[in-house]
Amino acid sequence: SSGSKDSTQGGSKTSSKGDNKLVVWTLTNDLVDYGKRFQEQTGVKVDTVVIEPADYPTKVQTALLAGETEPDIIVGEPQMLDDFYDAGFFANLDDFGAQDYKDKIVDYVWEVGQDSDGIQRAISYQITPAGFYYRRDIAKEVFGTDDPDEVGKLFSSYSTILDTAKKLKDKGYRIFSSDAELSYFSGDSAWVVDGKLNVDQARYDYMDLCVDLYKNDYTAYATQWSTPWYQAMAGEVPILSADIQSGADDSVNVWDSTQFEEATKDAQKTSVFAFGLPAWGVLTMRDHVGDTSGKWGVCAGPTYGFGGGTYIGISSNSKRQDTAWDFVKFCTLNEDTSDWWIDYSQGDTVSYLPALEKHKDDENEIYGGEKLYQFWLEQAKGIDYSKVTRYDKQIGDAWSQAISAIKTGEKSKEDAVNAFYDTVQSTFPEIEIDR
């Protein structure tokens, strides 16, 4: 409990009272807003530094290994956390009584914040399960319904997705901007089981689906985060070619909106049916839907997936750990803060269960009045975190490279899969591989 903490750490308690300050190192702007609010409510001066995700692990490592006592608050995305835990960078939150709050946070988020010994090291303020954001008007026209449960059936397996894509193309639409929209639904099994590489049939089914979507022109060939990808949220987009997407044809610059418009002014146009994104996609879509606002719905995909999320903890070197714990609680375990964030962010999905419960009947007008908090909570309940391993990002990237090599004709399926095995073997020699 916090009582025993005070007596064991008398020194740090006194010094933290002395300077009434916190230094936060984070990856996104969210904590800038949280920091300002914490400062307003507590009088603690919060100095928040936002660092590029690519540079973040190195910066934290350099500071903490050098014994720096600031930052006080550090964060991590899920794929960074295991290394941070192993290095001892995060203080033990159970010393502050974190387990008292176990039932207040969505299960998978609580588990992500634990190290391999089950000690709580970090907590996130948001849940990030994935779903498909689809156009209700197109669903009605092509499939006769825009009901999320019914539309979910069109995405319920890799083979039904291919069938859905064909029907949409026959009506002049494209199912996705590109096959990258499937990346959060790339499989439902662990990549590594008992030290062995595990490539199950579903991984191959996913691979085949990506290749088929690409080869049959079922997508608009618009890369995620590019100009046409954002445009597709607001309405019609030019249909690009596979060569433009792969970069083999560089006549169209998809990263510069002015050049893009000029280069594609005579191109055939289409509307894109769906985007595959985690719950934070609500915010991305909000800023880009324009005139299609109200015409969207959200439904489940073929597997339970999640992506991203900012997990907050205390630096083990911090001399202000009690104040830092107050900040962690303020961001993640506080109903007032959760209510404020739901409103302020215009729809980010918090992890604090009492707030999700309270907002479960909130209707989101951009999505035709759908009750999104209820939907995301259901999706989050389906996430089995025991299937997540520290190897996922690199093995998943290597599998994606194999898929790209097959769909662009650079390699045969057999050669691409063998190259995948080679990559895994050289990157992680400790993993046993049966070819």
Predicted feature residues:
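Loop/turn elements at helix/coil->beta-strand transitions in domains of secreted/extracellular proteins
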Residues: D19-L22, T42-V46, E68-D72, I119-Q120, ...
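Extracytoplasmic/periplasmic substrate-binding proteins
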Residues: V32, D205-R320, D326
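Bilobed periplasmic-binding protein-like "clamshell/Venus-flytrap" ligand-binding domains
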Residues: R121-A122, L168-D179, N334-G347, S426-D434
